[in-house]
Amino acid sequence: MKEVQIEAGWKKVLQEEFDKFYFEKLTDFVREEYRQSPIYPPARFIFRAFDTCPFDRVKVVILGQDPYHEPGQAEGLAFSVPTGIPIPPSLRNICEEIRTDTGQPAHIDGGSLLPWVEQGVLLLNATLTVRASQAGSHQGHGWETFTDAAIEALAKRREHLVFLLWGSYARRKSAMIDPRRHLILEAPHPSPLSAHRGFFGCKHFSRTNAYLRQHGIAPIVW
């Protein structure tokens, strides 16, 4: 993981995690995985969610579970794919909800969500790496501990953030977040398997912006 860098603000709040034994073991595991197998995202993008959205600039957190595990899709940002790559079904459903909620098409670049990131949307997967074609293959090796620490740091050190928790896995993270200090919005996952059970019609994008405006924070152009 020599290629990995992390933004200075995040480095400061997560320094204790880097020094813990679990992170040392995680580093050894991930380094060996990259040596032996095709792993996604490319190593230089492992911490891209943090690098592209500095700690002090986060306004909204969208939690994913795993990076995409097929060639060319994962770029270190939850739900996002590089421009030119076909848009995955969950992201298509997210775009559809934005259109019906806001009355505008999604402000994204193909399937890349960098235009959101640049406005302060942290696109964080709970597990930051995955073996090619093996969903969930890097779960349970320490990434979840690390990304939980990131969520807790935001929840405790910042205020008036919006946490968008889609699906049962993400919704479990609500226990770490004080609802008196932040807005927590929960819905089923935007996957085709569950989007019709309440993701469609959740209006999370307009509700996020209403909350941000209420607290004097510039809204997101979704």
Swiss-Prot record:
Its EC number is 3.2.2.27. It comes from Porphyromonas gingivalis (strain ATCC 33277 / DSM 20709 / CIP 103683 / JCM 12257 / NCTC 11834 / 2561). This is Uracil-DNA glycosylase. InterPro entries: UDG_fam1, Ura-DNA_Glyclase_AS, Uracil-DNA_glycosylase-like, Uracil-DNA_glycosylase-like_sf. One of its GO terms (biological process) is base-excision repair, AP site formation via deaminated base removal. It comes from the Bacteria. The keyword Hydrolase applies. Excises uracil residues from the DNA which can arise as a result of misincorporation of dUMP residues by DNA polymerase or due to deamination of cytosine. GO terms for molecular function: uracil DNA N-glycosylase activity. Its main location: cytoplasm. PANTHER family: URACIL-DNA GLYCOSYLASE.
